[in-house]
């Protein structure tokens, strides 16, 4: 049983071992892996990390073997989320872009009986929906990547129409008819919530220092290390990466249906075939590993 992995070493490489290297308790065989904003940021050198690291933060995988406890997971298919005990999967610890990989059990999410490609993005949809549920009106979303779009769609489904601040490409969000600000001078000053989703530090700095808001919501996927803040009477900083409740599942399903219309699925028989597909264009794609 040979192991192939898409590893970022300063550049993207496909590394092959004659056997399977198991570093974490849960050995997985990935089935679907979503490739999107995080992988693009890493490959283009926009997101600093300590290489080498196996890419792939979101996906669906079958558990092949478990060491220690949780042996009941063996043979089951799970969605895999990027949030766990050891940092962000595919960025701070080895991810899913491999024919076999091992992870800590804290990254396993839902058990799937009939896995579909769109399930690979369900953890991101759930994360974005959780952010939407925590937001106070009016809502300004910083960034125009997939996390930002999904948060906006979830807000729309619960009756809140957000606005966006995007210094870079806004094409993905624009096609859904949201209000988009491109220049800080055009942005309305007072907001209920500002949601930070991008890795653009300059963008986040402008919003948090120049605008008034009651609540600041920070996605861990924005890799926000620190933010200079003005003194305010009421300010909260929140990292949201919890599971969604059953109350939110209808919103998750609606957003999933929307996303399935714009995300393509690419089948590959060998990981070497993905090199020409990376870095991915927005909104990314789902890799189906045979």
Model-derived regions: residue spans:
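C-terminal hydrophobic helical "lid"/dimerization subdomain
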Residues: 140, 244-290
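Extreme N-terminal starter segment of soluble prokaryotic enzymes
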Residues: 1-3
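Extracellular beta-rich ligand/substrate-recognition surface
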Residues: 5-13
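Mid-domain Rossmann-like dinucleotide-binding core that forms the NAD(H)/NADP(H) cofactor-binding site
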Residues: 116-189
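NAD(P)H dinucleotide-binding glycine-rich loop of Rossmann-like/cofactor-binding domains
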Residues: 80-141
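Structural motif
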Residues: 81, 141-145, 165-168, 196-201, ...
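Glycine-rich beta-strand-centered segment in the early N-terminal region that forms part
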Residues: 20-34, 44-84
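Glycine-rich cofactor phosphate-binding loops and adjacent beta1-alpha1 units
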Residues: 136, 174-239
């Amino acid at each position: 049983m040979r192991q192939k992995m898409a590893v970022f070493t300063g550049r993207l490489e496909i590394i092959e071992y004659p056997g399977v290297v198991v570093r974490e308790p849960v050995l997985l065989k990935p089935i679907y892996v979503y490739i999107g904003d995080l992988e693009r940021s890493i490959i283009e050198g926009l997101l600093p990390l300590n290489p080498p690291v196996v890419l792939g933060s979101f996906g669906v995988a079958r558990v092949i073997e478990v060491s220690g406890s949780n042996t009941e997971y063996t043979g089951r298919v799970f969605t895999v989320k990027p949030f766990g005990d050891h940092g962000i999967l595919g960025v701070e610890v080895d991810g899913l872009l491999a024919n076999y990989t091992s992870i800590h059990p804290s990254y396993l999410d839902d058990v799937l009986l009939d896995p579909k490609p769109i399930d690979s993005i369900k953890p991101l949809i759930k994360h974005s929906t959780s952010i939407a549920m925590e937001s106070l009106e009016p809502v300004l979303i910083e960034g125009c990547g997939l996390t930002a779009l999904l948060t906006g769609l979830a807000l729309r489904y619960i009756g809140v129409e957000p606005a966006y601040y995007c210094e870079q490409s806004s094409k993905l969000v624009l096609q859904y008819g949201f209000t988009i600000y491109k220049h800080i001078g055009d942005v309305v000053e007072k907001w209920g919530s500002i949601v930070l989703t991008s890795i653009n530090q300059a963008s986040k700095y402008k919003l948090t220092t120049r605008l008034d808001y009651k609540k600041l919501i920070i996605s861990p996927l924005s890799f926000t290390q620190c933010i200079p803040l003005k003194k305010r009477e009421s300010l909260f900083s929140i990292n949201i990466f919890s599971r969604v409740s059953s109350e939110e599942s209808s919103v998750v399903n609606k957003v999933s249906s929307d996303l399935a219309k714009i995300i393509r699925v690419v089948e590959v028989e060998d990981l070497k075939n993905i090199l020409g597909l990376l870095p991915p264009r927005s909104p990314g794609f789902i890799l189906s590993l045979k």
